[in-house]
Amino acid sequence: MAGRWFTFGFFLGLAVVFFSWPGAQLAQASCGAVSCFVTIGSQQQVAMEGLLTVNGIYNYTPMRLLPGTNGVIPGLDTNQRQMILDHHQETRTITQTATLDLNYGLTERLGLEITIPYMVRTHHHIDGLGEDGPNGEGQSTTFSSDGIGDMRVGVKYNVLPTLRSLVVFGFGVYLPTGVTGANDSTGALMEPTTQLGRGQVGLNPTIYQTYELIPHRLNEFAFGGYRHTFRNNVGYQFGDQWDLNGGLNLVTVPWLVLSAQLNYRYIVHDNFSSSLSRSATPADAPDFPGEPVVIDPTIKNRQVPTTGSTFLGFTPGFSVNLGQMIESSWTRMTSLYFYSSIPMVRDSNNSLAQGTSFIF
């Protein structure tokens, strides 16, 4: 465990060093297992030709049950290609991500972006409802994993560069570099939704826009993104994801910018190629607790009923321009920022929902 946190701390420290490197810059700020999604302008803009901008980002995203939900969801056995209804009861997930984001200007309008996330994820649920325990109450199971997540490589093109506005189209590809074979505390393979990687390539077109309402004082920004992940080798396909963000930045003094944004995310249901069973219930006595009851042995594409979610959050924050406060080669064009994403509306289909998240 000590080695795991040393590795995470080393990566986070490395990210902070890069974030402070001359040339790192901020213009605005978007936020698994989901991860917080906040819009950071220096990620979305195209760097000047020949210039490398570097962002070091840490985000903390807790997920817990919403009031009025019980967290009972299907169990997914990828080895046997089996979906078992009402087999798990979710408790919590915490995801911490340290991201190194690199942007390089190929031309005045065309840029290259590489995003490298390092993740630490912990998860707890009750496994084997109707199957384990003297009364079918299941078994407490924990999961912890750390490592590189799915990297993203993309290009961006600035189609409308003016003194007061920007419109940037982007297209990225998520590479299956994240861990997909981690086990839980019982030694069983953990389900795809909790692994650090998705195990398959994903496509991610984006659009980013900003306009100075009051030059050098107040600007608005908007971001839209879509992510499609192809079915992986264990028959699992994550649902398509839509992100929409919009907000304002106010320059109070040259070194302090206040920001506020709304963040909306919609994720459709996941799909799993599997047979279908259900957990045993007291009505199945004397075979209770007992093995899951088969409903349909045919392996075919099935919607995972408790996946998919809707999230609307409000994210206040601020950024500090170190170059305006301290004149040195290490602080020139360098900014620090902090954001807190506060949930306003959430629907997670009886599963875990994103809580208040922090990004800096």
Where are these regions (language model features)?
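Repeated loop/turn-to-beta-strand initiation elements of outer-membrane beta-barrel proteins
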Residues: L110-I114, V153, L163-V167, P215-E220, ...
